[in-house]
C-alpha cells in the first residue's frame, strides 16, 4: 500500500460545490514516492482515480465496473517504445527550392510557445450542458449527471494541468443547464 498526501481540489466553483457537497475531487502525491501523482473523484456513485507513475505515460486507473455497481476495475497501462521497429519519417523532402520544413522553422524560432509553465496555472470557467440521454445513462438524476461530469473533469484536469497549465472549473449555476428531463429536450 502506498500512502498519499491528499488535498481537496474541486472541479466545481465554490457556489456549485456548496450545492453538491457530496461530489468532489482530490489531488495528491505519494508520501514516500513524490513522483507518484493522484487524482481522485468522489461522489455517492463511488470513486474514480488515476495514479501517474514514475514516467508521465505510466498510469493506473481505478473505475467503477459499471453504473450502480460496487465492483471496481483497476487498469495499469504503460506505453513502451518498440525498439525493434524504430520510428522512421517517410515524408519526402520539400521539392520547392527554398521551402523550409517545419523542423527548420521550429529550430529557427526556438520555443515560440511554452506548453506549460509550472509556476502559472490558468483557470477557465466551464459551462457544460448535457442531454437527457446522458443523464439517463448516469441514473437520470442531476446528482448522477454532475458526478459523471466531475469524473470526466478530474481526468481532463489531470492532463491539462500537467501538460498545458490549465484547469477547468464548472460555473456557479451549471446545475441549471444539465438536462435530466426527456421533454422538453433543448437538443
Language-model features and meaning:
Residues 1-67:
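N-terminal prosegments of processed precursors
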Residues 71-187:
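Fold-level signature of zinc-dependent metallopeptidase catalytic domains
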Amino acid at each position: 500500500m502506498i500512502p498519499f498526501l491528499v488535498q481537496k481540489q474541486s472541479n466545481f466553483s465554490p457556489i456549485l460545490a456548496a450545492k453538491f457537497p457530496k461530489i468532489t475531487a482530490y489531488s495528491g502525491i505519494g508520501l514516500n514516492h513524490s513522483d507518484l501523482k493522484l487524482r481522485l473523484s468522489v461522489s455517492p456513485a463511488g470513486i474514480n482515480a488515476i495514479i501517474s507513475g514514475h514516467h508521465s505515460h505510466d498510469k493506473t486507473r481505478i473505475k467503477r465496473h459499471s453504473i450502480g455497481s460496487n465492483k471496481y476495475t483497476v487498469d495499469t497501462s504503460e506505453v513502451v517504445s518498440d525498439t525493434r521497429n524504430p520510428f522512421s519519417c517517410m515524408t519526402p523532402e520539400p521539392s520547392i527550392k527554398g521551402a523550409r520544413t517545419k523542423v527548420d522553422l521550429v529550430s529557427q524560432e526556438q520555443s515560440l510557445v511554452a506548453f506549460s509553465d509550472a509556476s502559472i496555472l490558468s483557470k477557465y470557467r466551464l459551462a457544460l450542458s448535457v442531454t437527457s440521454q446522458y443523464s439517463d445513462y448516469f441514473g437520470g438524476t442531476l446528482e448522477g449527471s454532475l458526478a459523471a461530469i466531475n469524473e470526466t473533469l478530474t481526468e481532463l484536469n489531470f492532463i491539462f494541468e500537467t501538460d498545458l497549465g490549465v484547469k477547468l472549473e464548472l460555473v456557479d449555476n451549471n446545475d441549471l443547464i444539465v438536462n435530466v428531463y426527456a421533454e422538453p429536450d433543448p437538443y
